[in-house]
């Protein structure tokens, strides 16, 4: 089996700790976020959410990027983007759709994709796979 290289799409309060945990366990980890400001903060070992300490960021070996093409180096992709709900309690899946579209552009045979974001049953089959 090839070496596992993990990408985390979405570096918020869920994605960043997940990326750090994989990195601590010696997995090559790529952290991706569409927010360039967020990526620049993380490159300086700063987490404004307070979820991960500066010390833990300094010890981690994560490649932070805002270029989705960098995800092509990974073979195990985890999507951790927000899924806010509107005033009618309907989830906004636009960030899931965007993440799936970007990963779909670089996906290789035998790659694995996991949606860690909060979604209702059927989202993978109905929304993610067709993209």
Model-derived regions: residue spans:
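Hydrophobic Val/Ile/Leu positions in short beta-strands of Rossmann-like dinucleotide-binding domains
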Residues: 7-8
């Amino acid at each position: 089996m090839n070496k596992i290289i993990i990408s985390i799409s979405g570096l918020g309060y869920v994605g960043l700790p997940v990326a750090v945990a994989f990195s601590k366990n010696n997995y090559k980890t790529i952290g991706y976020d569409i927010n360039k400001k967020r990526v620049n903060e993380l490159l300086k070992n700063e987490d404004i959410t307070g979820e991960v300490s500066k010390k833990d960021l300094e010890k981690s070996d994560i490649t932070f990027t805002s270029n989705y093409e960098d995800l092509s180096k990974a073979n195990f992709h985890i999507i951790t983007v927000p899924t806010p709900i509107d005033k009618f309690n309907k989830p906004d899946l636009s960030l899931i759709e965007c993440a799936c579209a970007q990963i779909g552009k670089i996906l290789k045979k035998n790659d694995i994709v996991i949606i860690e974001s909060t979604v209702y049953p059927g989202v993978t089959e109905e929304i993610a796979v067709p993209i």
